[in-house]
């Protein structure tokens, strides 16, 4: 794997801005069949990541109860409005409300070996690729690296078969 990240990455990835409505971002992930995307500011620099893991609460079907059951006791909420605000904050209405603000980035000129090591060490599935000005220029996934490994293997074995 002597290639650089720039040679393998997906250039110009789909991105979202922090104020993007969450519903729009979810539809984008689903329609493009991707599991996550970088969140960028107006200058194109990464400020977060939105992944399907961040969105898992959607499947929970959280509702606003008037009370909470705890150890067979009923506890009535003294301030349902505050609970409602906290619930909406937790569920989020924009990308900024649910995104992960820690961005895993790698430089476009870094090696694939470094990228693979980062993904392994951090236990992540994708890296946001940035240029020298820290602007998002691509995305690199585990799948991209595995495909490159398979391609390199095929090219190395082909001369042996001839």
Regions found by a protein language model. Name each.
Residues 48-51, 56, 125, 138-145:
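Short hydrophobic beta-strand motif reused across regulatory alpha/beta modules
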Residues 50-54, 58, 62, 82-85:
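N-terminal short leaders/motifs
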Residues 120-121, 125-128, 132, 145:
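Extended hydrophobic
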Residues 1-34, 39-42, 46-47, 72-118, ...:
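Bateman/CBS regulatory modules and CBS-like beta-alpha motifs in cytosolic regions of diverse proteins
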Residues 30-33, 54, 63, 123, ...:
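Residue-level detector of secondary-structure transition/capping positions
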Residues 56-71, 145-160:
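A short, polar/charged loop-to-alpha-helix boundary motif
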Residues 132-140, 149-153:
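Charge-rich, low-complexity terminal tails
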Residues 104, 120-124, 151:
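Alpha-helix capping at helix-to-loop junctions
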